[in-house]
């Protein structure tokens, strides 16, 4: 990596950590979207592993409901691992230009869902039936694009968790997705010691950005910030989808 690229990555992780500090999520989504503009997605995903793992473990252990969350979600988490390891083959084998298209589609689908915010509530019976399916699909999307949010986020929001439980449930899903993605990349020879050290260096700007985001969260209009963030993801997704047409 040359010096301008180091600086760009440093700023990306500050921005991604800042978004997570303000909203409680978004670090992998922002980081993958922006890193994907300057490097292959497999490299971007490898760079993301440690800062994503550290910040999501922080979120996972931030409340008192870990045992409750684990009891409800262990089966979904198991299928996230399976889907991610399988899907990661696509991330390392598809040409970077077309992998970027997949990431762009994932960003737009997530932003569209979050902008519309349809109200969904799932019964206990459907939860038992669909949790493995949602885990498998989330894992496959994670493995193929490096983005953890679809359909895990809307699914977890539909399960009627309390506020603190939902924060920990999201932390659990993102933590498992991060570990599974690292395992998938390693199995496909796309995660090496050099990338581990670079990923470790990214912890500092990510935590700095997260701290800044938490500091200013109470001072900014969260609704307006969220709208601008989702519109930004949509524009970024459209740009990634358009690349093959402009190549």
Each language-model region and where it sits:
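Selective hydrophobic functional segments
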Residues: 47-96, 179-223
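Residue-level signature of transmembrane alpha-helical entry/exit and packing/kink sites
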Residues: 5-9, 72, 76, 100, ...
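Hydrophobic residues within alpha-helical transmembrane segments
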Residues: 11, 15, 50-57, 74, ...
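Hydrophobic alpha-helical transmembrane segments in multi-pass integral membrane proteins
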Residues: 44, 86-90, 140-147, 181-184, ...
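Structural signature of hydrophobic alpha-helical transmembrane segments
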Residues: 5-6, 36-53, 97-107, 136-146, ...
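Juxtamembrane helix-boundary/capping and inter-helix hinge elements in multi-pass membrane proteins
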Residues: 38-42, 63-70, 157-165, 188-192
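Transmembrane helix exit motif
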Residues: 56-67, 88, 102-127, 214-215, ...
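Selected transmembrane alpha-helices and immediately adjacent juxtamembrane segments
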Residues: 1-38, 120-170, 177
């Amino acid at each position: 990596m040359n010096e301008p690229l180091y600086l760009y990555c440093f700023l990306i992780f500050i921005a991604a950590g800042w978004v997570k500090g303000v909203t409680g999520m978004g670090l992998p989504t922002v980081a993958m979207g922006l890193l994907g503009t300057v490097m292959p997605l497999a490299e971007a995903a490898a760079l993301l592993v440690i800062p994503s793992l550290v910040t999501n473990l922080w979120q996972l252990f931030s409340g008192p409901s870990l045992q409750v969350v684990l009891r409800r979600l262990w089966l979904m988490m198991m299928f996230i691992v399976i889907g991610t390891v399988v899907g990661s083959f696509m991330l390392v084998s598809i040409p970077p230009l077309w992998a970027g298209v997949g990431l762009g589609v994932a960003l737009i689908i997530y932003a569209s869902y979050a902008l519309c915010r349809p109200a969904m509530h799932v019964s206990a019976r459907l939860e038992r039936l669909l949790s493995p399916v949602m885990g498998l699909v989330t894992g496959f999307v994670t493995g193929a694009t490096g983005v953890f949010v679809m359909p895990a986020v809307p699914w977890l929001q539909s399960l009627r968790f309390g506020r603190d439980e939902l924060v920990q449930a999201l932390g659990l899903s993102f933590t498992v997705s991060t570990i599974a993605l690292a395992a998938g990349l390693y199995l496909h020879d796309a995660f090496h010691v050099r990338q581990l050290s670079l990923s470790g260096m990214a912890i500092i700007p990510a935590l700095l950005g997260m701290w800044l985001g938490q500091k200013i969260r109470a001072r900014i209009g969260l609704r307006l910030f969220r709208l601008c963030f989702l519109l930004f993801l949509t524009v970024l997704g459209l740009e990634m989808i358009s690349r093959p047409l402009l190549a």
